[in-house]
Amino acid sequence: MTRKLVLLRHGQSQWNLDNRFTGWVDVELTDQGRQEAVAAGKLMKDEGLQFDVAHTSVLKRAIHTLQGALKELDQDWLPVSKSWRLNERHYGGLQGLDKAETAAKHGEEQVKIWRRSYDIPPPAMDVNDPGHPCHDRRYATLDRNALPGTESLATTLVRVLPYWHDAIAPQLKAGQTVLVTAHGNSLRALYKYLNDVSNEQILELNIPTGIPLLFELDDNLQVRSFRYLGDPEAAKRAAEAVANQGKAK
């Protein structure tokens, strides 16, 4: 039996548009981002996908993308689970900074390492910074020590995997079709795990906003195939645009 899993990065956010490091900052979708959510729903509808359950983060850009896609799918009623474990990677002291200006200051190669390397985190955010997640009530029930002040992709994967094993994988093994709407780096972490991508290869992976990535898995949740829905060239161009965000102007 083939299991189906769709990974969907949220639509364009205001800070995507502004080319700023976002991380755990809870920013809104742009008008384009809302349109991308609807377009993603249409692509999934055209594919004939009927989901049994959906998962998202606790950040509104992912939540609103999921809502827009489900409305287009006419599956608004779908059970939705929200978890902080699906949040974007925490960008530490870089959060809020302009990516191009940061590249001009520190060099494009350093910014690429901070953005795309596997195990090198950006400079940490001080725990006394008002933006640290320990001061946000949506995380009030969590162990303060579990809340990051910065993350690499490696530590993001450590955060995401328990949710995969405890929540998503059992549903797929039960034959359910699952939609996960999250963020560029939490989805890169899942992609790395599912496809057994090397630490070096993951550096070059960029996930575009608002384009559903369909995985077909076997009974043991091994990947049989995966592809972006819609025009492959459009997905390629969108991924290249993501890669260019960390370059100096």
Swiss-Prot record:
Annotated active site: H10 (tele-phosphohistidine intermediate), E88 (proton donor/acceptor)
CDD domains listed in its UniProt record: HP_PGM_like
Assigned keywords, A-Z: Gluconeogenesis, Glycolysis, Isomerase
GO biological process, one term: glycolytic process
GO MF terms, alphabetically ordered: phosphoglycerate mutase activity
Highest taxon in the source lineage: Bacteria
Top-rank EC class of the record's enzyme: isomerase
EC number: 5.4.2.11
Pathway: Carbohydrate degradation; glycolysis; pyruvate from D-glyceraldehyde 3-phosphate: step 3/5
Site note Transition state stabilizer, residues: H183
Alphabetical list of PANTHER family matching this protein: PHOSPHOGLYCERATE MUTASE (PTHR11931)
Family in the record: Belongs to the phosphoglycerate mutase family. BPG-dependent PGAM subfamily.
Function: Catalyzes the interconversion of 2-phosphoglycerate and 3-phosphoglycerate.
Quaternary data: Homodimer.
Name by which UniProt lists this protein: 2,3-bisphosphoglycerate-dependent phosphoglycerate mutase
Lineage: Bacteria, Pseudomonadati, Pseudomonadota, Gammaproteobacteria, Lysobacterales
Gene that produces this protein: gpmA
